[in-house]
């Protein structure tokens, strides 16, 4: 772990919403008197009927979580209507097309009309409060309209990432018993066209075989390509939009009414439908957005996440819009038409706050600095990372090269299940360490425990748990509360178990070490894959690395590393040996790499996450049953990895 501490920039500290003293006072109050603290901060959103009950939560036995349970509000009203008087003509949403020469700017007044018309189309087709509406759309403004329209009328949306296969869509339709789906004819990403409507048609057929019948399909035109059409079921959004009225009263929603279901992508088994409700989620998403990103009115905020993930829900749509922010949505790829696209968008729209994934950072770092240096990036004030731990080398590149050593990096740790940030720096309150998520957000009581559940004090490494509820927490798994209890609360009684490992250093900074199932057991010694990956990436020749375990006849598990080299660097026996020595030097001899496979590319989803389950199977020579790889951005990469695997002799 890096021990250098990066101070808070003077200009950030001077103007920040939260300074070090405020953080300490608020955090102490949030732990000692959570009812009073969250009762006060619940007022940040508007309520049609104020709450009198703040917190009613227990992690014991059957687990029950309720916040603001007698309050009445509406998420879309808070994200749009309440801003119209003062911000109606200000930009709510900037949309940057896949095409570098095309964009749109939508004001809050325009957003209101779009969402109301969308909501009325849904109502005209019989959608009502409590109905589940599936959304399978690319990153286009209509995706945000669809979410907000559902929230406006009380329908429960289930957004399905537009990179998912027909089988994955069908599984979500079946679990949610959804009979209405919103999709587009196609999606555009880089030089690719993805047939969304075809995927939906196949998914509907699969779902019908399980007695779930989708009766209505709204189609948004993104291209002019011909698509299969079912009369009486399918209808065009653009044909109904002009006839829908531009006003739609917001449904009065109880704070604990469901807002959305979002399915976690497990590698095996039935998908888990994480259920978030209305009041507490919006309080937490908006509060974390405001304070973690130190958001000031008028700033341009860009979260690169897809709306199919929780980050897109909380920090592209709901959090920013609830705060009256200008939020940027990007349809395309960070490498199209070349690796300078992100930085060109930053300059074009004068982005102040930029929030992206470590995988994207590492990939762009590997392309070289020239793509960054041809842009100005002078508008940037804050940088953020999300989705996985960021290794110190990538953190430093992001800080020094992209941020010109002046923009604090907000290394945020949280989950689909948490609704919002859990461990995170605050720009005006937190000195930084490269690769550390730093400290808990308000109201978050974290504990490190050993496998037996013993609480670890001081400098320690263990399993990360949270011992009390917070407003943004998931309430259950849709239609499967028993699985919810077993998955998150049965391992350590009375605690929410995150499934992640974590280190706490001597300064009480927290470092996420990766999923517990990403812990390798090498000759009885536990090693986190994230730690080994960080060591590899710290070598100047390495752009990206992914480490997995594989069966080893002596050690139990061996260390198998997939390595992508910097542009212009060629694999060699010398480099192979240098990397082994480098990791031994960084971590110790126990971390000796058993296999190194040089790979031009790693298998990633369209959201940029490395699909490690595929790498595990290749490393174990179990590649005959890789499962669904249709969610990969480039499925053909897998064939190259299999052909060049390094453990053929073990299999023989």
UniProtKB/Swiss-Prot annotation:
Any one of the GO CC terms: cytosol
N6-acetyllysine found at: 609
Residue numbers binding Mg(2+): 539, 542
InterPro entries, per database record: Ac_CoA_lig, ACAS_N, AMP-bd_C, AMP-bd_C_sf, AMP-binding_CS, AMP-dep_synth/lig_dom, ANL_N_sf
SUPFAM superfamilies found in the cross-reference section: Acetyl-CoA synthetase-like
Annotated positions binding ATP: 387-389, 411-416, 500, 515, 526
Record keywords, A-Z: Acetylation, ATP-binding, Ligase, Magnesium, Metal-binding, Nucleotide-binding
Function according to Swiss-Prot or TrEMBL: Catalyzes the conversion of acetate into acetyl-CoA (AcCoA), an essential intermediate at the junction of anabolic and catabolic pathways. AcsA undergoes a two-step reaction. In the first half reaction, AcsA combines acetate with ATP to form acetyl-adenylate (AcAMP) intermediate. In the second half reaction, it can then transfer the acetyl group from AcAMP to the sulfhydryl group of CoA, forming the product AcCoA.
Identification of the protein by name: Acetyl-coenzyme A synthetase
Recorded name of the encoding gene: acsA
């Amino acid at each position: 772990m890096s021990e250098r501490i990066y101070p808070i920039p003077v200009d950030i500290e001077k103007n920040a919403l939260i300074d070090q003293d405020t953080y300490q006072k608020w955090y102490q109050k949030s732990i000692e008197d959570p009812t009073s603290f969250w009762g006060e901060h619940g007022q940040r959103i508007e309520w049609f009927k104020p709450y009198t009950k703040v917190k009613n939560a227990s992690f014991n036995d059957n687990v029950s979580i309720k916040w603001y349970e007698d309050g009445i509000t509406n998420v879309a009203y808070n994200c749009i209507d309440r801003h119209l008087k003062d911000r109606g003509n200000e930009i709510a949403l900037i949309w940057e097309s896949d095409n570098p020469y095309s964009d749109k700017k939508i004001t809050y007044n325009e957003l209101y009309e779009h969402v109301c018309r969308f909501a009325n189309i849904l109502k005209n087709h019989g959608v009502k409060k409590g109905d589940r509406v599936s959304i399978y759309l690319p990153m286009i403004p209509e995706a945000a309209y669809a979410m907000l329209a559902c929230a406006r009328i009380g329908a429960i949306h289930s957004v399905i990432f537009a990179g998912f296969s027909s089988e994955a869509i069908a599984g979500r339709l079946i679990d949610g018993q959804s009979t209405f789906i919103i999709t587009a004819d196609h999606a555009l990403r880089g030089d690719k066209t993805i047939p969304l409507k075809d995927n939906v048609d196949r998914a509907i057929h699969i779902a019908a075989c399980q007695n779930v019948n989708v009766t209505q399909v709204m189609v948004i035109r993104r291209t002019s390509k011909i698509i299969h059409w079912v009369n009486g079921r399918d209808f065009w959004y653009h044909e109904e939009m002009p006839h829908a009225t531009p006003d739609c009263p917001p449904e009065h929603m109880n704070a604990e009414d469901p807002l959305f279901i979002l399915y976690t992508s497990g590698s095996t088994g039935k998908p888990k439908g994480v259920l978030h409700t209305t009041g507490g989620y919006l309080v937490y998403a908006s509060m974390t957005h405001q304070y973690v990103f130190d958001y000031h009115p008028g700033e341009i905020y860009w979260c690169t996440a897809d709306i199919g993930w929780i980050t897109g829900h909380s920090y592209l749509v709901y959090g920013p819009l609830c705060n009256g922010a200008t939020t940027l949505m990007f349809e395309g790829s960070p490498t199209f038409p070349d690796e300078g696209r992100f930085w060109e968008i930053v300059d074009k729209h004068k982005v102040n706050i930029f929030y992206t994934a470590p995988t994207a950072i590492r990939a762009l770092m590997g392309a070289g600095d020239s793509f960054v240096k041809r842009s100005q990036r002078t508008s940037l004030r804050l940088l953020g990372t999300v989705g996985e731990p960021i290794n110190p080398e990538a953190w430093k590149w992001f800080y020094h090269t992209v941020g010109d050593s002046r923009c604090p990096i907000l290394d945020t740790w949280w989950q689909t299940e948490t609704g919002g940030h859990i461990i995170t720096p605050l720009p005006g309150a937190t000195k930084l360490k490269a690769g550390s998520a730093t400290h808990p957000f308000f109201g978050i009581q974290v504990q490190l425990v050993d496998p037996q559940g013993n609480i670890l004090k001081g400098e320690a490494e263990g399993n990360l748990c949270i011992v009390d509820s917070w407003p943004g927490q998931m309430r259950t798994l849709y239609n499967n509360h028993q699985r919810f209890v077993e998955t998150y609360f049965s391992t350590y009684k009375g605690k929410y178990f995150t499934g992640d490992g974590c280190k706490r250093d001597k300064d009480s900074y927290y470092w996420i070490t990766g999923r517990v199932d990403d812990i390798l057991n090498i000759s009885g010694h536990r090693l986190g894959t994230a730690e080994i990956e960080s060591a590899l990436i710290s070598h100047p020749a390495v752009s990206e690395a992914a480490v997995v375990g594989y069966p080893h006849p002596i050690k139990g598990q061996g260390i198998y590393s997939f390595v992508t080299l910097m542009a212009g660097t060629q694999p060699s026996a010398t480099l192979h040996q240098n990397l082994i020595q480098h990791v031994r030097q960084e971590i110790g001899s126990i971390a000796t790499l058993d296999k190194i496979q040089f790979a031009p590319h790693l298998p990633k989803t369209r959201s940029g996450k490395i699909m490690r389950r595929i790498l595990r199977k290749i490393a174990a020579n179990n590649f005959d049953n890789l499962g669904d790889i249709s969610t990969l951005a480039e499925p053909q990469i897998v064939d190259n990895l299999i052909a060049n695997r390094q453990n053929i002799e073990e299999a023989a």
